[in-house]
């Protein structure tokens, strides 16, 4: 009997709508995963249905086009339904908030908690989205914090269980490198 393939979805929907920040992180993550994924594993790039070209291609990578836009007020209804259809084992949400009701494990990345420190700088839509952080932290099976400070904030301010939070610093894009001295 063949071993079961581990199906990991990476939520890349935001990359269609915004450049920089979390989109840059997500694309770097996908490039890195494309280099290490192997037999018995499949990375499913969860893209916006509007994003017709694959964000990244490679062996053991596939694309799933989703209808639910990121940060949409019905995201917590539509996205879980779409993910159920994809039969994922794990979904990684680089943009903080996973589907709270789902049939797979979830890993979230928390880049910082500036939205808690400076809520007056957020739009009404952003306030609604980031107000889900407490539920997201409780719901996630694992949490990636990009720094020790973010990990500390998650534990102290949001009540994350310390054993669920792993620090994995963000890496600079390979575009950035030391220059030769002249």
Predicted regions and their residues:
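Carbohydrate transferase catalytic cores enriched for Leloir-type hexosyltransferases
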Residues: 1-182
């Amino acid at each position: 009997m063949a071993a079961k393939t581990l199906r990991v979805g990476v939520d890349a929907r935001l990359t269609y709508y915004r450049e920089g920040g979390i989109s840059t992180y997500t694309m770097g993550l996908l490039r890195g995963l494309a280099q290490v994924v192997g037999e018995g594993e499949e990375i499913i790039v969860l893209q916006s249905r509007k994003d017709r070209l694959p964000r990244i291609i490679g062996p053991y990578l596939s694309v799933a086009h989703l209808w639910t836009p990121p940060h949409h007020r019905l995201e917590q209804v539509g996205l879980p339904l779409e993910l159920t259809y994809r039969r994922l084992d794990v979904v990684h949400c680089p943009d903080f908030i996973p589907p709270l009701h789902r049939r797979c494990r979830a890993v979230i990345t928390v880049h910082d908690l500036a939205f808690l420190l400076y809520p007056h700088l957020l739009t009404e839509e952003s306030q609604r989205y980031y107000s889900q952080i407490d539920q997201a932290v409780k719901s996630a099976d694992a949490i990636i914090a990009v720094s020790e400070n973010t990990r500390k904030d998650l534990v102290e301010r949001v009540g994350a269980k310390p054993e669920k939070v792993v620090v994995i610093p963000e890496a600079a894009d390979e575009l950035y490198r030391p220059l030769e001295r002249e």
